[in-house]
C-alpha cells in the first residue's frame, strides 16, 4: 500500500523529490533511504566547516531530482552558507580573516608569485605579462576540498609553474596596530618590488616611473585591503580612503614622504651633535646652518631648547672661539642668538686684524728705483768695486803731490816725511775709507 500511495502522489505533485520528502508516510515508516539522508545531513555539516578553503560549483550546475539519492560529494558542493563566487575583482573583508586560510594557517604562509592574487586579475590571452596563479594556491570556490578525496595539483608541477618566472614572493605581514603602519608599509613596498611592480611605486618627487594599469591598481587595492585591515589604519590613511577608497598610490606617496622626513630628522640630529667651527667659514653661514637645523627639528616635533642647542654649539668650537665655553657656560638663560653675537664679534676681530697687515706686492719699477739709491747687499762686488778703484786713483795722486811738495819745501825734514808716511791718509769720500801707503 505504501508503495502504491507513493506512486500515486508522484503523478500529481510537481516532482517525485517533493512528494517523497513531504509525505508523512516516509517519516512514520522506516525507509532504507532514510539512512542515506541522515548521512547526507552529516556530510553537509562537515562541509560547512571546510568551506573556508573549498569552492562551490557555478550557479548553472544541475540540481538532482531526488535528494535521497544525492551523493555526499554533491551535498558538499551545494552548501547553504556559500553561494556562487561573486564575479567581481574586489575582495570582501571576510577574505582577509586569518580563519579563512585554514589550509595554510595564516595568510603570511601563502606562497605568492610575482603580481598575482587571483586568476581573474590577469588579462586574458596566452601572452599575459603576469604569471598565472597555480591551482594549489588561490583556487576558485568550485575546486573540491582535500577531504572529499580529490587532491591538489602535484607540488612538483606547481613549483615548476611558479618558479618559471620567479621564486615565491613572501607577502607582507598582517597589520595589527596603527602604530606599526610605518614599518608595515616598508614591507609592503618591498613586496611590490619583488612582484615586478617597482615601477609604479612613487619616487622622491612623488611620481611613479610609469603609469599604473587597471589590473595593477586592482592588485594594489586587494593586497592592501587584505593585509592592512581598516580598523588598524592610521587616521591620515582613513582620511585618504574616505575620499577615494582605491587611492592606494596616494597612501604610498605620503608614506614615502614621511620616511624621508624621518631620515632627515635623524641626519639633522647627527649634524647638530657633530658641529665644528674654527672661523674658517663665515659666521653668517655657520649661524644659518645651525638655525635651519633647529627650526626643522622643532617643526617636526623634536623640540631643541636654547640650553641644549648652546651646549652642542659650544662643544664644537675650536681655536679662538674655544674660550666661549668657559665664559658662557655659567649663563643658564643664554640663548642661541646671544651665543652667535659673541661668535660674530670674534670673527669680525679676526677679519680686521688680517686686513690691517700689509700684504700687497711691490711693483718692479719701485724695486729698480730703490736699487739705484740704496746699496744692494746681495751684489757687494758690483757696488763696492767701482768706487774703490776711483778712490785708489785719487789717493795715489794725492800721495805723489804730497811727496813732491815735501821734497821741494826747505822747512820740511825727515821726521815730517816719516810722520806723513806712517799716519793714515784721510780721504773725503762718502765711504770714509782709511788707506795706508804700504798697501800700494
UniProtKB/Swiss-Prot annotation:
Positions of post-translational Phosphoserine modification: 416
Biased composition, class Polar residues, residue ranges: 48-60, 71-93, 127-152, 419-428
Region annotation (Disordered) ranges: 1-93, 126-173, 352-440
Keywords, comma-separated and alphabetical: Cytoplasm, Phosphoprotein, RNA-binding, Transposable element
Sequence ranges of Basic and acidic residues compositional bias: 429-440
Additional detail: Retrotransposons are mobile genetic entities that are able to replicate via an RNA intermediate and a reverse transcription step. In contrast to retroviruses, retrotransposons are non-infectious, lack an envelope and remain intracellular. Ty1 retrotransposons belong to the copia elements (pseudoviridae).
Oligomeric and partner information: Homotrimer.
UniProt-recorded name of the protein: Transposon Ty1-JR2 Gag polyprotein
Originating organism: Saccharomyces cerevisiae (strain ATCC 204508 / S288c) (Baker's yeast)
Highest classification ranks of the organism: Eukaryota, Fungi, Dikarya, Ascomycota, Saccharomycotina
Gene that specifies this protein: TY1A-JR2
Amino acid at each position: 500500500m505504501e508503495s502504491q500511495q507513493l506512486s500515486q502522489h508522484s503523478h500529481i505533485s510537481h516532482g517525485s523529490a517533493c512528494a517523497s520528502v513531504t509525505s508523512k508516510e516516509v517519516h512514520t515508516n522506516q525507509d532504507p533511504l532514510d539512512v542515506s539522508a541522515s548521512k547526507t545531513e552529516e556530510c553537509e555539516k562537515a562541509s560547512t566547516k571546510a568551506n573556508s578553503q573549498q569552492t562551490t560549483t557555478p550557479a548553472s550546475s544541475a540540481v538532482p531530482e531526488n535528494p535521497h539519492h544525492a551523493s555526499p560529494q554533491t551535498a558538499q558542493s551545494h552548501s547553504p552558507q556559500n553561494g556562487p563566487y561573486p564575479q567581481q575583482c574586489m575582495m570582501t573583508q571576510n577574505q582577509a580573516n586569518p580563519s579563512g586560510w585554514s589550509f595554510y594557517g595564516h595568510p603570511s604562509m601563502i606562497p605568492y608569485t610575482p603580481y598575482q592574487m587571483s586568476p581573474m586579475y590577469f588579462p586574458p590571452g596566452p601572452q599575459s605579462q603576469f604569471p598565472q596563479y597555480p591551482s594549489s594556491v588561490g583556487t576558485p570556490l568550485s575546486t573540491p576540498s582535500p577531504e572529499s578525496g580529490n587532491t591538489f595539483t602535484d607540488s612538483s608541477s606547481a613549483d615548476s609553474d611558479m618558479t618559471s618566472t620567479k621564486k615565491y614572493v613572501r607577502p607582507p605581514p598582517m597589520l595589527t596596530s596603527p602604530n606599526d603602519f610605518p614599518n608595515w608599509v616598508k614591507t609592503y613596498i618591498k613586496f611590490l618590488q619583488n612582484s615586478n611592480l617597482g615601477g609604479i611605486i612613487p619616487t622622491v618627487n612623488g611620481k611613479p616611473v610609469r603609469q599604473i594599469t587597471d589590473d595593477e591598481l586592482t592588485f594594489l587595492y586587494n593586497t592592501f585591503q587584505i593585509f592592512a585591515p581598516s580598523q588598524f589604519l592610521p587616521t591620515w590613511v582613513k582620511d585618504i580612503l574616505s575620499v577615494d577608497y582605491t587611492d592606494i598610490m596616494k597612501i604610498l606617496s605620503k608614506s614615502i614622504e614621511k620616511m624621508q622626513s624621518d631620515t632627515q630628522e635623524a641626519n639633522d640630529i647627527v649634524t647638530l651633535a657633530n658641529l665644528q667651527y674654527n672661523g674658517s667659514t663665515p659666521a653668517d653661514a655657520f649661524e644659518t646652518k645651525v638655525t635651519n637645523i633647529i627650526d626643522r627639528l622643532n617643526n617636526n616635533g623634536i623640540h631643541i631648547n636654547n640650553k641644549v642647542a648652546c651646549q652642542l654649539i659650544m662643544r664644537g668650537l675650536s681655536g679662538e672661539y674655544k674660550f666661549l665655553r668657559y665664559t658662557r657656560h655659567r649663563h643658564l638663560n643664554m640663548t642661541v642668538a646671544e651665543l652667535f653675537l659673541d661668535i660674530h664679534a670674534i670673527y669680525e676681530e679676526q677679519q680686521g686684524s688680517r686686513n690691517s697687515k700689509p700684504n700687497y706686492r711691490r711693483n718692479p719699477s719701485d724695486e729698480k728705483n730703490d736699487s739705484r739709491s740704496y746699496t744692494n747687499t746681495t751684489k757687494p762686488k758690483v757696488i763696492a768695486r767701482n768706487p774703490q778703484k776711483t778712490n785708489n786713483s785719487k789717493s795715489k795722486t794725492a800721495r805723489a803731490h804730497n811727496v813732491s811738495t815735501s821734497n821741494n819745501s826747505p822747512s820740511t825734514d825727515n821726521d815730517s816725511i816719516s810722520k806723513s808716511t806712517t799716519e793714515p791718509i784721510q780721504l773725503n769720500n762718502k765711504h770714509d775709507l782709511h788707506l795706508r801707503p804700504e798697501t800700494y
